[in-house]
UniProtKB/Swiss-Prot annotation:
GO terms for molecular function: DNA-binding transcription factor activity, RNA polymerase II-specific; E-box binding; protein dimerization activity; sequence-specific double-stranded DNA binding; transcription cis-regulatory region binding. The keyword Transcription applies. GO terms for cellular component: axon; chromatin; cytosol; nucleoplasm; nucleus; perikaryon. This is Transcription factor ATOH7. Disulfide bonds: none annotated. The lineage of its organism: Eukaryota, Metazoa, Chordata, Craniata, Vertebrata. It comes from the Eukaryota.
Amino acid sequence: MKSCKPSGPPAGARVAPPCAGGTECAGTCAGAGRLESAARRRLAANARERRRMQGLNTAFDRLRRVVPQWGQDKKLSKYETLQMALSYIMALTRILAEAERFGSERDWVGLHCEHFGRDHYLPFPGAKLPGESELYSQRLFGFQPEPFQMAT
């Protein structure tokens, strides 16, 4: 911790009269300590936020590695990654639900493999295949995703 030594007032600042005995009041040192303490707390909060964001970005990177993204030359945004993960999970859920309706594994495997081919899986729900007017999520899942606005 810094020592409480007067460093001289800035130009044009009002100078408090010295306390009895020719020394500055103890309140000045306490004020400097409070400022230093606040600065330390701010630095600690910044470090915590930096670690939190690094953890969040690491989690998104790991999710991007497991979510299929055929034909993508660029890294998916966080929003696109979440949309792809949702679409992928829903497709897998649908396959498992329909698998329960069929007796053996061989009966249903061929029915759904086309959903995981490049031509049937899009970068994000709502994207269209070339020459297709129906939304992918509507065709695959039977629902229309609600529009989502990004806060700026």
